UniProtKB/Swiss-Prot annotation:
Family label: Belongs to the Sxy/TfoX family.
Highest taxon, organism lineage: Bacteria
Keyword set includes Isomerase: no
Biological processes per GO annotation: DNA import into cell involved in transformation; establishment of competence for transformation
Protein name from the UniProt record: DNA transformation protein TfoY
The organism of origin for this protein: Aliivibrio fischeri (strain ATCC 700601 / ES114)
Signal sequence, start to end: none
Function: Required for efficient DNA transformation jointly with TfoX1.
Keywords: Competence
């Protein structure tokens, strides 16, 4: 299938960095260095808007991309540029630079904010969050302050059935922001000794 808008967009935006595209939202997300800042869907290039640029996009007559999720419309932060913009590719590039900057800043904010709930940490699920809550640990900050060993001990004390060593590795990985399987054997032995 020929996708001229996608090809033209990738060609135009490639000067911004290492460009890739992935299928998403019924179209293709456009990424520079793993940061999505544009979307090609319904044969239109959409650029990511920020709180500052959203009004500018609306003034220019750009429409947000809307898709349905469970039957309800979801309005995205991606606005379709008008076909006339293709007559001035430099103006698209200028807006794309702003869109990329916005996307990078949003990505950094998300990274630094971190998960707000325990279940959103690596390795942990809702069941683990409930076990920790029963043990008196209700927030991500409390878990980090308690530490994996003490959190594991608290779960052992409040749980009638036995809990596996894997839970200890999962807690340690969650606190460190990594998958439990990459925790070294040395660290696992140190943690086991503290039990």
């Amino acid at each position: 299938m020929d996708k001229p808008v996608l090809k033209d967009s990738l060609r135009l935006l490639s000067s911004l960095g290492k460009i890739t595209s992935r299928s998403m939202f019924g179209g293709f997300g456009i990424f520079i260095d793993d940061t999505m800042f544009a979307l090609v869907v319904q044969d239109k290039l959409h650029l990511r808007a920020s709180d500052e640029t959203i009004n500018l996009f609306k003034e220019q007559g750009f429409e947000p991309y809307v898709y349905k999720k469970r039957g309800f419309p979801v309005v995205t932060k991606y606005f379709a540029i008008s076909p006339e913009c293709w007559d001035e590719p430099d103006s698209i590039l200028i807006q794309a630079v702003v869109a990329l900057d916005v996307a990078k800043k949003d990505k950094e904010k998300q990274k630094s904010a971190g998960p707000s709930r325990i279940k959103d940490l690596p390795n942990l699920r809702l069941a683990t969050e409930r076990m920790l809550k029963k043990a008196g640990i209700t927030t991500v900050e409390e878990l980090k302050n308690t530490g994996s060993v003490n959190a594991y001990k608290a779960i052992q004390q409040t749980h009638s059935s036995s809990v596996s060593d894997e839970l200890l590795w999962s807690l340690e990985g969650a606190i460190k922001g990594m998958h439990w399987s990459v925790i070294s054997a040395e660290t696992r032995n140190e943690l086991r000794k503290q039990l």
